[in-house]
C-alpha cells in the first residue's frame, strides 16, 4: 500500500472536522502562499504533462463534498475564499454557469490573466463528486486582474460536445 493510501483516510477525516482544523497549528498564509507559488511556477516551468488544473481536479475529487453547502464550507476552512454558487442554475441545465469567489488566495498578485487554475480544477472535481457529472471550469475574471471577484465559468462536458 502506498504511503498516500495509508494516511489519506485520516487526512480526509481531519479536513471534515472543524474542531481539528481550528485547533491545528497553521502555517502562516504568506509562507504557505509562497511555497505554493514556487510549486505552481515549477510545474509550469517544467512543462509538466500534469497541469495545475488536473492536480486541483484530483484534489477536489478527494475532498468529495456531498453538496454545495459543504463545498462552500470546505473553501472557507481552507482559506480559499467565499464561494457564490446558485445550485438551482446548475440543476436547471442552463449553461454556462457562473461561480464567483471573493477573498481568494493571492489576491495581492497583479497579472494580466487569471491565476487560479488550481482552484478551477478543485471546483471541477468537487462539482463532479456532487452532481456525478463531468464539468470543465475556466476562470474568466480574476482579482489579480483588478476585478472585485474571481469568476469561473462552468460547463458540463456533455454541453461542450454540442
From Swiss-Prot:
InterPro entries assigned to the protein according to its UniProt record, in alphabetical order: NO_sig/Golgi_transp_ligand-bd, V4R
The record's annotation in Pfam families points to: V4R
Alphabetical list of Gene3D superfamilies matching this protein:
Trafficking protein particle complex subunit 3 (3.30.1380.20)
> Of which family is this protein a member?
Belongs to the M.jannaschii MJ0150/MJ0739/MJ0745/MJ1460/MJ1642 family.
Protein's name according to its UniProt entry: Uncharacterized protein MJ1460
Amino acid at each position: 500500500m502506498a504511503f498516500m493510501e495509508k494516511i489519506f483516510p485520516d487526512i480526509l477525516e481531519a479536513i471534515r472536522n472543524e474542531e481539528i482544523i481550528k485547533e491545528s497549528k497553521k502555517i502562516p498564509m504568506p509562507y504557505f502562499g509562497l511555497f505554493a507559488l514556487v510549486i505552481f511556477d515549477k510545474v509550469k516551468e517544467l512543462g509538466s504533462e500534469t497541469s495545475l488544473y488536473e492536480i486541483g481536479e484530483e484534489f477536489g475529487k478527494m475532498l468529495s463534498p456531498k453538496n454545495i453547502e459543504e463545498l462552500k464550507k470546505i473553501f472557507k476552512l481552507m482559506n480559499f475564499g467565499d464561494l457564490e454558487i446558485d445550485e438551482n442554475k446548475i440543476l436547471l441545465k442552463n449553461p454556462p454557469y457562473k461561480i464567483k469567489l471573493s477573498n481568494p488566495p493571492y489576491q495581492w498578485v497583479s497579472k494580466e490573466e487569471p491565476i487560479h487554475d488550481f482552484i478551477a480544477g478543485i471546483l471541477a472535481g468537487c462539482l463532479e463528486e456532487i452532481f456525478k457529472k463531468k464539468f470543465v471550469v475556466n476562470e474568466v475574471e480574476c482579482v489579480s486582474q483588478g476585478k472585485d471577484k474571481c469568476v469561473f465559468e462552468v460547463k458540463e462536458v456533455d454541453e461542450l460536445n454540442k
